[in-house]
Amino acid sequence: MSQQNLAKLISLAFTEDRVFNDKTSDLCLAKNSQTSFAIKTREPIIFCGKEIILEVFKQLKQTKKFKNSSINIEFFGNDKDSFKSGETIAQGKGCARLIFASERIILNFIQHLSGISTTTNQFVRALNNPKISILDTRKTLPGYRFLQKYAVICGGGKNHRHNLSSQILIKDNHLASSEKNINELISSSKKKYQNLKTEIECDQYFQVLEALKSNPDIIMLDNMNRKNLIKSIKEIRRANSKIIIEISGGINLENIKNYRDLDIDYISIGSLTHSIRAVDIGLDILHP
């Protein structure tokens, strides 16, 4: 996780939420008021966001308003750990105004990211085949990609390419817009970008046959019906066993078990990041 990018994102959240002008807390709480709190799960989760909690408190304490404020926190687990419903992730004590200023920002981050890690882990367990990796995609929120991809790792998944420069991925729209055919595009890519992997997206069996002429590093079988999917996998393995096979499109928690026994390497799932449900985590004030 990039600490520099995280610091910038948290700073943006402070500005957005006007944390230094919390009129309600200033009205209700004395400046030196202290309180204890606990961050608890309200459903089973795979946790992601420990560094975010620490960074939020750290940045607030460095500001003029809270520079003399105290905050102490103890964690009862780390990123990637599982928590049952009702369990405490962290507990602490400190300046009440600081805690209320940070509450919603912390929860927004960790509910979303723990939602990604929890769902990713559900896919990994439903697939139940360690030889096949669950991958994310670039279908992420602007500015949040590094966090969302980190959350996928916390859930037991792996990252696909991080940006447009990190790997060649020739998709259907490229094929529709280019004057070159599949074979020519793969050959050009391997010659020009020898330090990058070249991947080709195929949604038809004839495209697989064309792609195999140039031996791409990865072939993505996208939205293929079962018959063509199995036929394509067999042909790829017959032609070149070193080619990585990725499948994608329409795969969910209900049907992923249908792909468990296929001779493939990756399953990429856009819903891990683009339509995730935030998990239920709360920050509760503890009374003596």
Ranges and model annotations:
Residues 1-203, 207-209, 213-214, 218, ...:
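Acidic/glycine-rich phosphate/pyrophosphate-binding loops and surrounding catalytic core
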Residues 219, 285-288:
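Short amphipathic alpha-helical segments
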Residues 223, 249, 271:
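Short secondary-structure boundary segments
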Residues 238-244, 287-288:
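Short acidic, glycine/proline-enriched helix-loop-strand junctions
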Residues 247-248, 285:
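Short glycine/threonine-rich catalytic loop with a Thr-x-Gly-x-Asp
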Residues 253:
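Cys/His-rich Zn2+-binding cysteine-cluster or related metal-binding knuckle/ribbon modules and their
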Residues 268, 280-285:
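Conserved, well-ordered active-site substructure
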